[in-house]
């Protein structure tokens, strides 16, 4: 804290916040003089983790205590005091983590859920290494149409130079390891790449911080950064992709093998991911819009499939050297919560390592069952997957199911302009 204030002596305010189950920032602004007392703990209502996407508290039948809005102590997460995108010289931001009434990490906090799953890997002497990619559209709020530059077009940095330079500058200031900004094939669609790391929880923190930072910087330049999974019906959607491998205690990649001769560790992890994939979709696609991205269109997966160097598969084995062999998980939408996405991915890999043998592995890898195409179907499949429910936590799983069903009911009750346009 003292080191930060030495670098940013003009700091006046600090935004202290939690990330709710949807990855939304929930918090408040305090004076910098109150930062020292906040470091010892501050209080937020437990119901922060029972909110839907619109911020409404959704209470499950098993947890009416939420309605009492009890406060819980929240402590700063080490290494997350950063300059804010909102006037970085005078404003900072700090991530918090909640504890329950007994002082244990709060079970509904997505960050805690991911920590628990990662700990299971470490218990086995396995260390996941991940690298995220997140896509978004940069929409000119003044223009009538978006400009297409083409996939990997090198002129994009000059076209959007002020925005890109500012984003790179602020990402560096926030210690976000942004390694690339890539132009996608669609008009004004970009992909943000973050450096691979074995600090799995920290990587997911960085995804949320980068998503927020991108939105703020875009607004400064008259753009809107749109991370919806499917913002335009005729264009490709936005995905949140994770590249993942497993290291041993010595740091050696346990997936290392020739592309056409995947080793047993890789094949078991693939089989586990495929087996849990239909149930996982309730997490990967957190709203109705996310399922529109998974309808047959361009390079987005519609089957629980895998393949070498193909972007139409949900699980892709990218081109790489043997020592850099990895799996790319392509199912999640850009609006998904990265903590929950990664906790679900790792759960699938654990399932393969703990429950699948060589005989059933081949059958699973050959199968490619279709994924649920509607949210209510995905939630129903999720409810019938005890391994995934247990891994994410029964309390969290109940809250997620209840919250998503409430959101779905509200959405389905809306009369759209398309309906009224064709009314008799």
Give the residues covered by each predicted segment.
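Short, hydrophobic beta-strand segments
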Residues: 94-100, 190-197, 244, 329
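Core alpha/beta catalytic barrel or barrel-like domain that forms the active/cofactor pocket
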Residues: 128-140, 174-194, 225-246, 280-288
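Glycine-rich tight-turn/loop motif centered on a GG-T
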Residues: 149-157, 196-204, 251-260
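Accessory "access/gating" subregions that flank catalytic or transport cores
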Residues: 164-172, 178, 194-199, 211-225
